[in-house]
Amino acid sequence: MSFDFMTPNKTKNSTVGNYAIVETSGTQFWLEADRYYDIDRINANVDETVTLDKVLLINDQKGFAIGKPYIKGASVQLKVMAHKRGPKIIVYKMRPKKKTRTKNGHRQELTRVMVTSISNGEKPKKATTSAKPNTKKPSTAVKSSKVEKTPE
């Protein structure tokens, strides 16, 4: 029995690269680098860069990093591409035999963003050009085996 329906938009042989699970506007999103996503409206202008700090999980070449609840120092950089509105959803309420009918429509405000980078907060290690020799002198302190007693 195969559960292929649980992984939409993924083929069996596809490999997933770097991704992060972030929280924004009360929902969690699976974000991959260099992809577009429509999320709830963000208060930012078009072509601005937005940083999301509430990162729950990161998967990169080194492996998984899971936060408790968030990963310290991790961030996802987003570029705002456009502001738009979602499809209209019709809400129709009716009470039978009472001639009571209401019809309302709703369009969700959305922001289209592109993920530019995913960072886990680790600073890159500086390459050392030469190893420093051990220049510390050994201590000449002598350990005393006598213990002084305080008068009671």
Curated annotation (Swiss-Prot):
Keywords: Ribonucleoprotein, Ribosomal protein, RNA-binding, rRNA-binding. One of its GO terms (molecular function) is rRNA binding. Belongs to the bacterial ribosomal protein bL21 family. The lineage of its organism: Bacteria, Bacillati, Cyanobacteriota, Cyanophyceae, Synechococcales. One of its GO terms (cellular component) is ribosome. The keyword Iron-sulfur does not apply. Residues 127-143 have a biased composition (Polar residues). This is Large ribosomal subunit protein bL21. It comes from the Bacteria. GO terms for biological process: translation. Part of the 50S ribosomal subunit. Contacts protein L20. This protein binds to 23S rRNA in the presence of protein L20. PROSITE patterns: RIBOSOMAL_L21. Residues 115-152 are annotated as: Disordered.
